Amino acid sequence: MPDVKCVCCKEGNECACTGQDCCTIGKCCKDGTCCGKCSNAACKTCADGCTCGSGCSCTEGNCPC
């Protein structure tokens, strides 16, 4: 079974974890142990188009400040 990339996104990074709850708690996005540049289209849009600087929080296509 191939690795499944989570759709959760923090500051333009996504968690690429299998069998972990990073999508729920965002832990591996925060500690950076398995983060990569976000490939999720909605998150890319958020990360690239956020006008809130470091205040941008991207989760599953939502881009709140």
Curated annotation (Swiss-Prot):
Induction: By heavy metals. The keyword Hydrolase does not apply. Keywords: Metal-binding, Metal-thiolate cluster. This is Metallothionein-B. SUPFAM superfamilies: Metallothionein. Metallothioneins have a high content of cysteine residues that bind various heavy metals. The gene is MTB1. InterPro entries: Metalthion_4_echinoid/annelid, Metalthion_4_echinoidea, Metalthion_dom_sf. GO terms for molecular function: metal ion binding. Belongs to the metallothionein superfamily. Type 4 family. The lineage of its organism: Eukaryota, Metazoa, Echinodermata, Eleutherozoa, Echinozoa. Transmembrane segments: none annotated. It comes from Strongylocentrotus purpuratus (Purple sea urchin). It holds the Pfam family Metallothio_6.
